[in-house]
């Protein structure tokens, strides 16, 4: 688990810059994750029975009426909390009646750890529309949280609709499962990876991110990344080595640097 990723996710949940949380320096990634989930679950823990009752009441109502209540009366925050108690077939039907803007607002309020089943059941076309809307507004932290739980096949299809390579890296910036990101990256074409590499080396934070992703790849995949990096710029691997040594992950990139 990457500590910096978890710190960024906690900062987003608290609506504070990560730099302001230096009083948490003694906490490791697991402790930061626990703190974040406790904070995100606090409202649900307090009002869970209320949200469950509202969701239960809506089970018998026609989907069109339930959808109107969600968008016109409850709003995105209550709808997000109700979603954890709504039968999955009902939730999927309602989502088909929501526009992408409202779905994106609901996504911003949801707790990623509680959405795995919903992400597995929602049609990928709906997820693509929500993703496009969140990318449009720069909500990379929201997408990063969901990336840890969305089925890999769907995640790969969604990556295809994100045209800006830097956006994919910004999303990864907030994803804890770098191993899953590495697997998805390895499924991309050489052309796509070259675009990602070029975007990464234009921003120091993204260069670190692509380094952490490459750390999770096997030797063969690292060698492929090395060759593609050289195609972009033969000086880039030297820059990557300096940053990796500074950040302490150079020993995990032996195949990348020796290729």
Indicate where each model-derived feature is located:
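Hydrophobic packing positions in regular secondary-structure scaffolds
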Residues: 1-259
